[in-house]
Amino acid sequence: GGSTSNNKNVQGKSGYNESIPVPDLVTQVSKYLHTAKDQRADPHAVYILSTGSNDLYYGSQKSLHLLKMADQAVDTIKCEAKKLIDLGANTVVLTSITDMGLTPSFRHYGNLVMRGGSNAYMLRFNQNIREAVKELQQPNIQVMLADLYKYSEDIYKSAKRHGIKNTPDASLQGFSKTEKQHGVKKHKCDNPAEYLYWDLFHPTNRAHQLLAQAVKSDLF
């Protein structure tokens, strides 16, 4: 967790104190190609490039230029996708980002300014990623959009139908630094499948399963 698109623009971090640097998308693609056969992409594989939310989370702690961050993130994703295509990839999937305003972190510890900035970043990113999918199109190459924003909104609105009873709270509570600072005691619910979110930011296994089903149904 904690990875961003490009650490030169926004450094991704992990750990309780968010002090452990983690590899970005650029590094991950580079390492994959370095170890791949003949340092080329597998033409039979599906390459899913999914990043962007952490650029906002970590970037907004040091800068208010959120739209520039969104532009830089999508430019990086587009560059890495093109690199894979140029080296033999035939099927590439880019993803939109979900509404961070729905996460327990923003619901319980955010404010109107944070929500407004998050929404502006999300709209800009998702607009740009759709344009990137169009720009990357080539004959005999499949470049597709997995619209995680749309899928997650659909799941949120129909949560009860999927057996999800709790959408605003985290299944696992009190384990983050933010929660500790707010006096939240450590607690794990008995049935995480009834929750939309596992922790302050990440969906539960059940929510991930529903997202995967939506991607498969929409694209494959």
What do the PLM-derived regions correspond to, one by one?
Residues 1, 45-50, 55-58, 85, ...:
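Structural recognition of the beta-strand scaffold that forms the well-ordered cores
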Residues 204:
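Short, conserved phosphate/pyrophosphate- and ester-handling motifs at nucleotide-, phospho-/glycolipid
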Residues 1-75, 79:
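Conserved SGNH/GDSL esterase-like catalytic core that processes O-acyl groups on lipids
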Residues 214-219:
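C-terminal alpha-helix
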Residues 39-40, 80-91, 124-145:
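A structural motif corresponding to the C-terminal end of an alpha-helix
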Residues 38-43, 47, 86-87, 138, ...:
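Extracellular/periplasmic catalytic domains that process cell-envelope and extracellular macromolecules
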